[in-house]
Amino acid sequence: MTSTIPIRWRVVLVAWLLAGTLAFAQPSGEPLASAVDAVNMTVSDLDRAVNFYTRVLYFEKISDTEVAGESFEHLEGVFGLRMRVARLRLGDEYIELTEYLAPKGLPISRELRSNDRSFQHIAIIVSDMDKAYAWLRQNKVEYASSGPQRLPDWNKNAAGIRAFYFKDPDGHPLEVLAFPPDKGSQKWHRSSEELFLGIDHTAIVVADTDSSLKFYRDLLGMRVAGESENYGTEQEHLNNVFGAHLRITSLRSPSGPGVELLEYLAPRDGQPFPADERANDVLHRQTEIVTADARTAAQKLVSAHTKFVSSGLVTESDGQLGFRNALLVRDPDGHPVLIEEK
């Protein structure tokens, strides 16, 4: 049942952030990013999206909330908004699905390719790839790969991984992935009767890995957990991009799923992130990162000349939406990142 929550927020303008003092400083050496909380995807019809994720992919709906008000407008950069947000869980990980009741945004372009810089997916770990693929086919999902691919043995960092790209009803890319015994977190190898186990990471296409590392590693404090260079017919058919040659960098924070950077060394013809993308467009996906002190994070983001979507730091006085302070920014390629203090 949908509930409407009264909103009591205030907006702290970015200019104010520059006046922050050492009283808000985090302990020395503590990363800004303490966890990746969720990936939030804008959808055109929340009921349809929730049905897909719960019925086909076995997510559990945790909450369904309707919100509106000036402070949300400042946070998301959309005037006159009213949003309905559902939070879903799979294993230990979460996603959020947001339908903008007003104003409606643009749909995802059918021409979106896996090497376009607006590409982002979540990687869902499965216990049995053959069973997962058969189930997805039975449910007539839209293909993004030509079929499941097994990455070749010559690629030591990825050998034996099986993966398949497909799309949800709105066109959001998704991946199912199965690790061989020598790869992936131990949690993915525990005995389980479940077919869909949880979310290992979200992957984003970037123009330049080193520039992205300055944001995710050097600014937010995420650590590099793995690197790989993938190419060949298996990678081409997984991404459905002829000649695909990728530099892949996996990043982790202390908890939650990882963030994976996908740089296409070839081909280099991927489209840039749309400069006019807005949070109510169905293309919108925001990675939600938890920080211990959003004010300190905001100050550092301003100092690093990060592009803000929010007009400033938004504070929720009663904490009913799960965080006290939050702001929405863009990474070097334009991918939205929500920084939130619980």
Question: Predicted segment positions?
Answer:
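N-terminal secretory signal peptides that target proteins for export/translocation
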Residues: 1-8
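Bacterial N-terminal signal peptides
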Residues: 10-23
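Vicinal oxygen chelate
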Residues: 24-31, 34-45, 84-97, 102, 108-197, 204, ...
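Core segments of cupin and vicinal oxygen chelate
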Residues: 42-93, 131, 138, 154-158, ...
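Extended intrinsically disordered, low-complexity coil regions enriched in Ser, Thr, Gly, Ala
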Residues: 47, 51-67, 101-103, 110-118, ...
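Short, charged/polar, Gly/Pro-enriched secondary-structure boundary elements
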Residues: 105-106, 172, 270, 335
